[in-house]
């Protein structure tokens, strides 16, 4: 839409500094004269479009097993979680015309369709609801308008790492950030 500042980039898995982004433009006129224009570009927001949603490219909020406190995964993740929340609040100060959807996830290691899986999901769904609420509360304390934040507890429907690899379990217990049109 005209007038909106939305940048789309493909996630590469690399952590890039702002100074590593460059605008390269080659201009060629009707007579064949050509010039190359190069300029560093400072991007303060990166959005990855996936499954029709605009995911903010920031570290996910990570939690300990069956926990919803922002510091439940240890000091390293507590500090990272707080940095991420500050970044999100800063983004929405700059772009107040957008909404924010928080998608909360959990880890279920049991096979889908089994009684163990269903029993575990009944425990995990309320945990993901509390995770989303904890993140929303923290963002509101950082000055965000609660009216633009919606939450969705997804349980273990969408793991982002193999659930059979214990070393990856921490990645699955998360809250992700989606930029939405503010209705």
Regions found by a protein language model. Give the residues of each.
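Periplasmic peptidoglycan-binding/tethering modules of Gram-negative envelope proteins
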Residues: 2-101, 113, 180-183
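Periplasmic OmpA-like peptidoglycan-binding domain that tethers envelope proteins to the cell wall
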Residues: 75, 105-183
